[in-house]
């Protein structure tokens, strides 16, 4: 019997005949000729080795944060990751970014995610945590929609500080557009923190009130508990966004009255990765009304038919693969591998390590702030964690370009988001920031400005 090998023109002719055409050209007859290319002007092909050499040359122009000290923060930070974290998540049992759709078969992955939930619950001070969202921004946006659902649509206003991270705010605005959620901002006071009086004027009929620890300017909001009380008195839910690396040295958001806590888990166990992938924290109080409305997957512990411990995905009727139209969220994948990496790192540090991490970051940030104050204006007084807002007289773009010439990556330009702050930038420090890097930065700034 004759074999039909590719290319098989008989199949092509059969399909053309079925649609009443005699050639491929007729299929594209409606497209103006000027838009159809006869051939692509591509160079001659190269061998794999030649491509390797060319790519290696291009990639060699990149510099790591160890070769070029960076003070660029504003949401993405250089943290040290213990070597065993990468080794463990690269094991074949874990190395997938996708959800186990036959979850009970994947007991190892489910247990790892259950441990992640337990560790985050201990950190944030709330007992119910999901198995992760995409990132902090989507977690915050999902929290806003959740507060509106909890009010059954009778309240559609969600209040955020104007100095919320601008990119997170953009995600929130995108999420809010479809369901018609109104986003209202509260101004900052002379110390760069939430203006309590402005909040009191705007909180009426709000579904939820949001605050960040630390805020976009790197400052610790001093009146978080009071903000929560104002929200609750007005019948609104209190949502707190938090950088979890600070939770060893400050009160947990749950202890400050938060109903919902969101944040960024990838600060543990994950490199910067050009900004992603991430894993958003999402936690709520032990209230079934809240639990049934929270987005994302929940891993629970139970017993199987033989009475043995088993891990399962629980309350799945909330999810889009069960009830798409009525799901609490239509996020259709998750960040399981990122969450497992975070869990391994957190477990490795333990309570003492988490506290020491926060203390070192706080100390390094204070040193950076002190030295920056010698060469530029610090607009807001207060305690900073990681980020420090600095204002210059000279255009910051020029300053940044000069720093790059001196092999130093400067801070994040804030003026494009908040013109009233002038030529301002956020400079960041973490536990990896070395004193000599800060000193080199200050010396360079003295030359430049």
UniProtKB/Swiss-Prot annotation:
GO terms for biological process: glycine decarboxylation via glycine cleavage system; nucleoside metabolic process. It catalyses: N(6)-[(R)-lipoyl]-L-lysyl-[glycine-cleavage complex H protein] + glycine + H(+) = N(6)-[(R)-S(8)-aminomethyldihydrolipoyl]-L-lysyl-[glycine-cleavage complex H protein] + CO2. Its EC number is 1.4.4.2. It comes from the Archaea. Keywords: Oxidoreductase. The keyword Oxidoreductase applies. The keyword Oxidoreductase applies. It is an enzyme of class 1 (oxidoreductase). It holds the Pfam family GDC-P. GO terms for molecular function: glycine dehydrogenase (decarboxylating) activity. The glycine cleavage system catalyzes the degradation of glycine. The P protein binds the alpha-amino group of glycine through its pyridoxal phosphate cofactor; CO(2) is released and the remaining methylamine moiety is then transferred to the lipoamide cofactor of the H protein. Belongs to the GcvP family. N-terminal subunit subfamily. The glycine cleavage system is composed of four proteins: P, T, L and H. In this organism, the P 'protein' is a heterodimer of two subunits. This is Probable glycine dehydrogenase (decarboxylating) subunit 1. The lineage of its organism: Archaea, Methanobacteriati, Methanobacteriota, Thermococci, Thermococcales. The gene is gcvPA.
